[in-house]
């Protein structure tokens, strides 16, 4: 039972590799009944076609019975067409060209319309209800997979900021200053900004998929926590933090794609939002755990705690996290058929496409295209700068909080960590606003047939004021009462979280064929800003501080910049269609 339910997990892969289990025998009766190769989709399509014709005839007979029934049928057809449009948009938001593994569905539909031309050696899903297709997994299995994704994402994001409560001890032990001590945070963030440039395209290769990248990099990530806990010099710690940042990046970059692999397209935005809540909440919860370790033991126990959390998560993933990429699942099916039958003619469409793609072209698209699109596309450049500054401002709070809560209110190390929980409360409000916007604006426009990509920007336009307000409010109320800076956190998350969701949805729809490159470039910009801001943050606050307002002018400086950048959604709402029409990468050009 376990083998059947989790046949594409690492543990089952190992059992299969050593010959202790055989997976895929059930497909022999489907693809080679009586030893003769057949195209199972052709048979399924023929049967499906007859059933659909019968249903159409019955529907037309019933529809002539009363005019009321005709109106109901017409209304249902309108809703179905709107849902089809909804699904199409969600596929575009998911990456169009396979970022969420939806290519095979279109091709399967096209092949089904011409069963006489079906290739008996072409391996595809056995119709839309194929039980091995992740969309058709049981609800409990889908939930378990998504929960594992969220836990894995949270732990990797925790790795960035869990270190911060122990920074003073590290500086004292290794006799270094604040900037060098902060490098351990910055290099980790820079690592997970660079990693997606390499790992995101690899996750789209059908012979690799997502699960092996998540697992093998996380295994190395877990092992290196031991090295971080035992290191004896600051240079070694900085290097280890950079490497672990790179290793944690696969799930941070493509975890959303795995959510899309598992969920039906129309539900993807909701679950992506929930996954993003974990990505925001994890870095702000980590300082609480780090502070507890520093108070109870010392800074090295921060990494021992990371080791224990990683180890428990790793066991779950090894045994229960299956491959989710649709194309990789088909590749595995074809590979098993080739092995079981001894016939090398079984293949998938993705395999043929990859064989025809030169390695040099793949590398060029991977490394150069994200930078090229930033340089040539004003829409991408504008939002990359905007989001990068927001992300940098987020990491500035790790420098500002000790100044405010420890310096002014004399909070303990653990209490300073607890002050970050305002961001978590803000996530609840932010996610609620996102769901309301999707239902009341986006979905409504779909049903009316009036959707256009710029509608996503309404969310950023409505909440854009919250970002500069939160920075001004945080800076100028810091000495009034400790609760006021925490309230500012709510407004910050409300704005930044929904800016991210609106921007990523907008960019994905504008550039569906190049969404992986768009997001890789955006991640690089975000990581670069987030790595740099903590390095100069304390110096900025110290230079601009006054006795009464220690963080006011520093926060105000960033706040004024965000005021200017908050105009970007308004400008692109008006001029976005014209810019897309002149783009060399947009399908609207």
From Swiss-Prot:
It is a multi-pass membrane protein. Residues 107-116 have a biased composition (Basic and acidic residues). One of its GO terms (cellular component) is plasma membrane. It is found in: Cell membrane. It comes from the Eukaryota. Residues 50-116 are annotated as: Disordered. Disruption phenotype: Increases the intracellular accumulation of 5-flucytosine and clotrimazole. Pfam families: MFS_1. Multidrug transporter that confers resistance to 5-flucytosine (5-FC) and clotrimazole. Further confers azole drug resistance. Plays direct roles in extrusion of 5-flucytosine and clotrimazole. This is Multidrug transporter FLR2. It comes from Candida glabrata (strain ATCC 2001 / BCRC 20586 / JCM 3761 / NBRC 0622 / NRRL Y-65 / CBS 138) (Yeast). The gene is FLR2.
């Amino acid at each position: 039972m376990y083998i059947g339910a989790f046949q594409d997990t690492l543990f089952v892969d190992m059992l299969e590799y050593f010959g202790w289990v055989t997976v895929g025998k059930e497909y022999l009766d489907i693809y080679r009944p009586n030893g003769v190769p057949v195209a199972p989709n052709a048979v399924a399509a023929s049967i499906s076609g007859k059933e659909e014709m019968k249903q159409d005839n019955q529907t037309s007979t019933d529809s002539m019975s009363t005019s009321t029934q005709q109106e109901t049928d017409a209304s249902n057809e309108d809703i179905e067409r709107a849902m089809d449009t909804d699904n199409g948009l969600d596929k575009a938001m998911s990456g169009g060209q396979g970022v969420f593994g939806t290519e095979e569905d279109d091709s399967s539909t096209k092949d089904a319309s011409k069963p006489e031309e079906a290739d008996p050696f072409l391996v595809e899903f056995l119709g839309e209800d194929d039980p091995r297709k992740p969309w058709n997994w049981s609800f409990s299995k889908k939930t378990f997979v998504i929960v594992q994704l969220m836990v894995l994402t949270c732990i990797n994001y925790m790795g960035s900021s869990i270190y911060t409560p122990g920074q003073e001890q590290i500086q004292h032990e290794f006799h270094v200053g604040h900037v060098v001590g902060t490098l351990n945070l910055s290099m980790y963030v820079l690592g997970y900004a660079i990693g997606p440039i390499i790992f995101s395209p690899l996750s789209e290769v059908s012979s690799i998929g997502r699960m092996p990248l998540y697992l093998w990099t996380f295994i190395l990530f877990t092992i290196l926590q031991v090295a971080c806990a035992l290191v004896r010099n600051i240079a070694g710690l900085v290097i280890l933090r950079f490497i672990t940042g790179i290793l944690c990046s696969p799930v941070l970059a493509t975890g959303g794609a795995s959510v899309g692999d598992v969920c039906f397209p129309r539900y993807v935005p909701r679950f992506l939002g929930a996954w993003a809540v974990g990505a925001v909440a994890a870095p702000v919860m980590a300082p609480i755990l780090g502070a507890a370790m520093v108070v109870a033991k010392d800074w090295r126990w921060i990494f021992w705690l990371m080791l224990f959390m990683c180890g428990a998560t790793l066991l779950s993933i090894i045994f229960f996290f299956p491959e989710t990429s649709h194309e990789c699942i088909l590749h595995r099916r074809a590979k098993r058929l080739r092995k079981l039958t001894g016939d090398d003619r079984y293949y998938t469409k993705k395999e043929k496409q990859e064989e025809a793609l030169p390695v040099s072209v793949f590398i060029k698209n991977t490394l150069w295209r994200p930078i090229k699109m930033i340089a040539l596309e004003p829409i991408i450049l504008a939002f990359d700068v905007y989001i990068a500054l927001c992300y940098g401002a987020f990491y500035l709070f790790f420098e500002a909080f000790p100044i405010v809560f420890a310096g002014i209110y004399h909070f303990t190390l653990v209490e300073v960590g607890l002050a970050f929980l305002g961001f978590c409360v803000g996530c609840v409000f932010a996610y609620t606003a996102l769901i309301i916007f999707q239902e009341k604006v986006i979905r409504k426009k779909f049903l009316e047939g009036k959707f256009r990509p710029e509608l996503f920007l309404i969310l950023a336009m409505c909440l854009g004021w919250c970002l500069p307000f939160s920075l001004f409010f945080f800076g100028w109320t810091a000495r009034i009462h400790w609760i006021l800076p925490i309230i500012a956190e709510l407004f910050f998350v409300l704005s930044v979280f929904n800016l991210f969701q609106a921007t990523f949805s907008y960019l994905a729809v504008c550039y569906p064929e190049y969404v992986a490159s768009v997001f890789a470039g955006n991640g690089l910009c975000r990581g670069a800003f987030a790595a740099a801001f903590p390095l100069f943050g304390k110096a900025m606050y110290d230079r601009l501080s006054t006795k009464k307002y220690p963080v006011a002018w520093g926060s105000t400086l960033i706040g004024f910049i965000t005021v200017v950048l908050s105009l970007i959604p308004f400008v692109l709402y008006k001029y976005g269609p014209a810019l897309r029409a002149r783009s060399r990468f947009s399908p609207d050009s």
